[in-house]
Amino acid sequence: MNKTIAVIGAGLSGIAAVKQLTDGGHQVTCFEKAESFGGVFADKKIYDDLHLTISNYFMAYSDYVPNHQKLKFWSKKEYINYLGEYIERFDIAKHIHYDHEVCCVQKQGDKWLVTYKNADTEQTKEFDMVAVCSGHFQKPKLPDLPGLDMYQGNIEHSNDYRDKHNYAGKRVLCVGLGESSADITSEISQVARKCILSLRRYPAVAPRYMAFQEDPYFTIDTSWLTSRIVNKLPHRYHGGITKGIFNKYVTSRNDHVRIRGEWLKKSGPSHHQAVTKNERLFRPIADGKVTPNIGGIERFEKNAVVFKDGTREEIDAVVFCTGYQLSFPFLDVSIANMRDLYKQMFIPEMGHSLSFIGFVRPQQGGIPVIAEMQCRYLSKLASGEAQLPTLSEMHDVIKYDTKHWQTEYKITPHVASLVNYCHYMDSVAKLVGCMPQIPSLFKDPMLRVKLLHNPQFAAQYRLDGPNNMTHTAREFLLSFPNISSWPRIIHFEVALAAQKLLSRLRLDGLREISK
């Protein structure tokens, strides 16, 4: 049963939506308000020095893995080139309407009316379904701080940052730390008279490449930290794995590595919080070009800032790297928290006719592959090959998932869309029917090692199920080097077997008690 589907946005999630929904035989129209695809990466105003903090194998879709390339972190230009190749390879361009801004989306009976604007013309078109792929980065979030309205210096959000030379010779305060903030603060420190970084707490910051490893395959997102087996084991194993690394950090002779290690220790367990995957900031901190102030801002004055520790600094400019807030101006639906949605995709009362794609932030791994998995599920729902649970069941799942993720990431509860990449991907893959069948060590030992002990690449979900690419996926997975030594593999296999045995014994014990 084919559907007419409107996709709003031709960024990473929108491209995935067009591809997966057309694969399902649906008639797809994608509206993009900009003149090109790629979302934030296509924005000419975004600073040119931007490099992705997720490696190319996790930022690529599962049906077009760039295995002809070495593992690397793409620049903005390189990633746009990949997306362009993807669009051309799968003939996606004919579905995208550029310079078409969606103004209003309204439900009328069992249809959706989408009103869009192109140049000076406004039109309305009817669809069976709407997939919102507009992304997180729509409405900059500015903190409400005492005295900010009285401050007379320049105020800018990272969304508007373009050129470090605008801050040459100035005293600059940067507020907040994420991937872009690490880049922006580092750049400004090169030309500023003084650069201060204000943070409320010590954040967990990870390097793109794992320290003390010569193997270029050993990046933060292609380490055993993103393997299926590590994420099947209790958190005490995570702590044991990372403790040795932290100890190496804090005893390093390199000041920037040592400082990062000290921050990591003070930030708390990394598996319980959002992690900034950009270590660039620590070199200017070590060199004295960036002065961190941990604790937060008390107030602003006419030409100064006062921190909660009592320190007062005169400043000429402020750059807020404080993220974005959800914004859907074309919808009359209010969503305060994506965790209120089933799988962070569906408003239960509206069914699958309205979906939100790509509004999940994985602690590790990339948003594009999560968006792709969501769209594979959406395509099955649209075709009638799958059905959403009942209303009460969806609300039960929402309640359970919300509690689970809030407990999992209790240190950074403000990052309300944060999930464990491995667990979330598996949960949706089960709904799609594309969970990989993991063989025993005796049947297919090499594939088992790649599926359990190597990174949980999206290609794993192309081995089985609908729209599988068994040969291509298997070839890629087997070609990737083992990231764990055989002693570590055996150790984890024994630990997993012991965990399964204990679970079985507990279950048997409960059955005996209930008799």
Swiss-Prot record:
- Keyword vocabulary terms for this entry: FAD, Flavoprotein, NADP, Oxidoreductase
Q: Which reaction does it catalyse?
A: 2 bromide + 4-hydroxybenzoate + 2 NADPH + 2 O2 + 5 H(+) = 2,4-dibromophenol + CO2 + 2 NADP(+) + 4 H2O; bromide + 4-hydroxybenzoate + NADPH + O2 + 2 H(+) = 3-bromo-4-hydroxybenzoate + NADP(+) + 2 H2O; 3-bromo-4-hydroxybenzoate + bromide + NADPH + O2 + 3 H(+) = 2,4-dibromophenol + CO2 + NADP(+) + 2 H2O; 3,4-dihydroxybenzoate + 2 bromide + 2 NADPH + 2 O2 + 5 H(+) = 3,5-dibromobenzene-1,2-diol + CO2 + 2 NADP(+) + 4 H2O
- Disulfide bond residue pairs: none
EC main class here is: oxidoreductase
GO MF assignments: flavin adenine dinucleotide binding; N,N-dimethylaniline monooxygenase activity; NADP binding
Query: What is its cofactor?
Result: FAD
Annotated FAD binding lies at: S13, E32, V40, F41, H51, V102, Q364
Query: Which domain of life does the protein's organism represent?
Result: Bacteria
**EC numbers:** 1.14.19.55
Phenotype when the gene is knocked out: Deletion of the gene abolishes the production of bromophenol-containing species.
Q: Which Pfam families match?
A: FMO-like (PF00743)
The UniProt activity regulation field reads: Activity is abolished in the absence of either bromide or NADPH, while a partial reduction in activity is observed upon omission of FAD. Activity does not require the addition of a flavin reductase to regenerate FADH(2) in situ.
Keyword NADP assigned = yes
| General function of this protein | Brominase involved in the biosynthesis of polybrominated aromatic organic compounds. Catalyzes the bromination of 4-hydroxybenzoate (4-HBA) to 3-bromo-4-hydroxybenzoate, followed by bromination and decarboxylation of 3-bromo-4-hydroxybenzoate to 2,4-dibromophenol. Can also use 3,4-dihydroxybenzoate, with lower efficiency, forming 3-bromo-4,5-dihydroxybenzoate and 3,5-dibromobenzene-1,2-diol. Can utilize iodide in vivo leading to the formation of iodophenols, but cannot use chloride.
| Family membership | Belongs to the FMO family.
This protein is called 4-hydroxybenzoate brominase (decarboxylating)
Species of the source: Pseudoalteromonas luteoviolacea (strain 2ta16)
